[in-house]
Amino acid sequence: MINRLKVTFSAAAFSLLAGTALAQTPDADSALVQKGAYVARLGDCVACHTALHGQSYAGGLEIKSPIGTIYSTNITPDPTYGIGRYTFAEFDEAVRHGIRKDGSTLYPAMPYPSFSRMTKEDMQALYAYFMHGVKPVAQPDKQPDISWPLSMRWPLGIWRMMFSPSPKDFTPAPGTDPEIARGDYLVTGPGHCGACHTPRGFAMQEKALDAAGGPDFLSGGAPIDNWVAPSLRNDPVVGLGRWSEDDIYTFLKSGRIDHSAVFGGMGDVVAWSTQYFTDDDLHAIAKYLKSLPPVPPSQGNYTYDPSTANMLASGNTASVPGADTYVKECAICHRNDGGGVARMFPPLAGNPVVVTENPTSLVNVIAHGGVLPPSNWAPSAVAMPGYSKSLSAQQIADVVNFIRTSWGNKAPGTVTAADVTKLRDTGAPVSSSGWNSVSSGWSVFLPQPYGSGWTFAPQTHTGQDAAQ
């Protein structure tokens, strides 16, 4: 599932959206169109409905799923190839019900189970934006590359009836703090955070769509494009337990804080979506996430162990697999103490991505590198190089295991050279137990918008959805 797997507008940027030229007609309600542009930001619609180097919302993004390849659709108001002839009822039916204009069910790469709780008011604004604020693009949709019989759509209708709730405007429980209620709506509705951060069941459905659905909600997802979305619950080891509300606010606004930095698929979310949220909405999300208890049993607390830093500083690394590689390739940025450099190179000591059960993200970023994208609030891009060509599979496995067990990190399992080879050569994720397996969920391939490489060159982001 996609999601991009995806949750401030400044006054100047409020009416802008991702590379679109506003095409308002005289009868369009300007305020409603502007509100719809913001709702589209909340849902990060542009991330999935725009192909790499393609025109905004014209579709064509390749999405790898367990049953084959599908392509996002053209949702510009073009009357022939887009949604220009959709009535509001038909638009609402597609977004919140998962049913397209011809009556067939959409592939659940479209997160309509989350969108089902969006308010009718937000839906009307979103419709106004797509009809009057988006430039029409006459680009036909690409047909899915799925073999028969998996290409038949009628089973999707059964899936929808089993796992997608009937659309209903979000209503908070009586007595809920209004700020938490707003955060709940943003996270579980348009933001569809659970599409990536919630584990999936036997039919690839999210195991819980909100906190009422149980402790699986936002407890960490399956690999998507070989990035594992971590837990957003308040576990102090693998979740947000050591994060403050202000940490969450700043992370979503800029993509970086003193003890963490965005990478992988979340880089797209910050670049195209959350950096444009209002401050009030970002604070609401932060307050809501901090209200979620850890999944029992909690893994306790993280305690830093200085013995690794002392060993590295002494130079006695030859007898410790991975330590010598760490000193030569990693310590210059992430330091001997595993503390990194604030707002540039994230710490490895106690990092939830490092100690989480599934090591796929760590293996992937070491093998292929990653990008910390620029934002309006932190306009410098930083990239980590990939080591798949300069280090052997065994060297990568050793340094991964070293990082996961140093500075007080107590990550489970052991990564092998075979795991690294499989991920590097075929794209298969690493399982939690240290052996190769197929991802349980949607495997989505969405390239980083800012490319790759090793760069500290200052960049600016103008609020338009195009790398500057």
Curated annotation (Swiss-Prot):
Entry's localization field: Cell membrane
Its recorded reaction(s) are: ethanol + a ubiquinone = a ubiquinol + acetaldehyde
Annotated heme c 1 binding sites: C45, C48, H49
Is Membrane set as a keyword in this record? yes
How does this protein lie in the membrane? Peripheral membrane protein
Name any cofactors this protein relies on.
heme c
Q: What class of enzyme is it?
A: oxidoreductase
Entries under SUPFAM superfamilies matching the protein: Cytochrome c (SSF46626)
Signal peptide (UniProt feature, chain positions): 1-23
Q: Which residues form the Cytochrome c domain?
A: 31-134, 178-293, 317-407
Which GO CC terms are listed, alphabetically? plasma membrane
Job of this protein: Cytochrome c component of the alcohol dehydrogenase multicomponent enzyme system which is involved in the production of acetic acid and in the ethanol oxidase respiratory chain. Quinohemoprotein alcohol dehydrogenase (ADH) catalyzes the oxidation of ethanol to acetaldehyde by transferring electrons to the ubiquinone embedded in the membrane phospholipids. The electrons transfer from ethanol to membranous ubiquinone occurs from pyrroloquinoline quinone (PQQ) to one heme c in subunit I (AdhA), and finally to two heme c in subunit II (AdhB).
Assembly and binders: The alcohol dehydrogenase multicomponent enzyme system is composed of a dehydrogenase subunit I (AdhA) and a cytochrome c subunit II (AdhB).
UniProt protein name = Alcohol dehydrogenase (quinone), cytochrome c subunit
